[in-house]
């Protein structure tokens, strides 16, 4: 008895593992150990088990079923059928772009937002020309922000799990009486539980991707927009994204994704997000031109462009100890510009951990875009110090960097406001994505 090398090679291809060296590293062994395992002389069954099989004249599969039948579903992972059902996320990556700057809607397009937060995605889609018919959000401060800025929006405050289970059409604030054009939202990135075979929605229960999928299946919009952190691409070795793509495909959508950098779309911030677009299959059959992501803008704003004449606002100061350290860092610099003894003391164990770590003790320059804003302005690993003052960015500066207009007011404590802005999709990035969707829908 030996390991089927053909099945291993096929599984490596499906999981984007190029070499046996890479496979060996992933499973925590040396290349020579893996080569020995895959040789014709290697038997994966221990000698005592073989002796038991031979003495009792019981085949291996029958013995395993008899002794550990409850785990057989896991053993079925490596079968021709299950491997054939796996998908390669990179086959869904779309590198097609189109100029959308002069696009305007030719019809009254509707959008329902899930996980709306403080409204970055919603506002951007509105600026593109989509009309909000609902915004679902749990956080009370974010809901107050949405209601303050858009009193006419149907802000549906509540747990999306309960809303989806009860049916969005049954909610008193959902009054759409026609086909929905766009469903949008950025659900959290969470690992899934695998049973060995794909069962569509059954694979994703217990995650916040599940209610999003429920609402998608209930409303069957023409198009959906899902955005997330760039890390989703390789989260859980790609299985998380691949399961999402599988579920979307089973729901009747042709799916595309790409990672878009906000700096390429008139935002003074290097912030990368994965954007997933799904188009209902009946539209795919009728389309005259395919969907394309928005073409990169020639404008590359930097911090001085974003913060020009920014209004004063609340903010969080550094501690005196941290302020003394950051005073030593020049604009555009970070911990590498500190004296060695101060850098070692400030960074602690991170000083010896290797890697880039250029976010620590980082002061942004006026002549560069900001690095990705976080939900807290003074986290040690991801500091974003003001260029000419030794302090974190204030909340209106945060909002400007995220391309919110000054007219967009935020509700809640300073901590809550930082969190709302830091979690948001940059408004201008959302607008570009919305224009690309409108450009596609205009053909029907």
Spans of model-derived segments:
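A short, Lys/Arg-rich alpha-helix, primarily the initiator
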Residues: 1-18, 26
């Amino acid at each position: 008895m030996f390991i089927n090398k053909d099945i291993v090679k096929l599984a490596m291809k499906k999981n984007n593992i190029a070499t046996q060296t890479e496979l060996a590293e992933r499973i925590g062994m040396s290349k020579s150990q893996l080569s020995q395992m895959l040789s014709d002389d290697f038997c994966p069954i221990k000698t005592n088990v073989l002796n038991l099989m031979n003495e009792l004249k019981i085949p291996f599969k029958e013995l395993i079923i008899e002794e550990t039948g409850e785990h057989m579903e896991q053993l079925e992972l490596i079968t021709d059928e299950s491997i054939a059902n796996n998908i390669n996320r990179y086959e869904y990556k779309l590198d097609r772009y189109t100029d959308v700057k002069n696009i305007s809607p030719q019809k009254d397009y509707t959008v329902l937002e899930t996980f709306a937060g403080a409204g970055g995605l919603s506002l951007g889609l509105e600026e593109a020309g989509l009309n909000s018919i609902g915004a679902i959000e749990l956080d009370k401060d974010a809901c107050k922000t949405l209601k303050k800025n858009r009193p006419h929006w149907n802000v549906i405050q509540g747990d999306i799990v309960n809303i989806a289970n009860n049916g969005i059409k049954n909610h008193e604030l959902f009054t759409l009486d026609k086909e929905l054009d766009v469903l949008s939202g950025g659900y959290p990135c969470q690992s899934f539980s695998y049973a060995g075979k794909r069962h569509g929605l059954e694979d994703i229960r217990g995650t916040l991707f599940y209610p999003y999928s429920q609402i998608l299946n209930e409303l069957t919009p023409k198009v959906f927009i899902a955005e997330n952190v760039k890390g989703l691409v390789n989260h859980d070795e790609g299985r998380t994204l691949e399961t999402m793509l599988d579920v979307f495909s089973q729901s009747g959508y042709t799916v595309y994704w790409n990672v878009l950098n906000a700096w390429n779309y008139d935002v003074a911030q290097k912030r990368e997000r994965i954007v997933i677009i799904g188009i209902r299959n009946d539209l795919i059959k009728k389309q005259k031109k395919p969907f394309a992501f928005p073409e990169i803008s020639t404008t590359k704003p930097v911090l001085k462009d974003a913060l020009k004449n920014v209004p004063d606002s609340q903010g969080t100061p550094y501690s005196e100890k941290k302020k003394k350290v950051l005073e030593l860092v020049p604009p555009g610099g970070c911990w590498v510009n500190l004296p060695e003894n101060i850098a070692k003391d400030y960074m602690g164990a991170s000083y010896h951990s290797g890697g880039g770590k250029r976010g620590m003790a980082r002061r942004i320059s006026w002549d560069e875009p900001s690095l990705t804003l976080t939900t807290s302005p003074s986290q040690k690993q991801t500091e974003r110090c003001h260029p000419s003052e030794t302090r974190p960015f204030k909340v209106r500066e945060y909002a400007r960097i995220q391309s919110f207009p000054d007219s967009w007011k935020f509700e809640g404590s300073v901590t809550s406001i930082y969190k709302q802005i830091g979690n948001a999709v940059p408004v201008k990035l959302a607008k570009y994505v919305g224009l690309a969707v409108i450009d596609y829908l205009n053909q029907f």
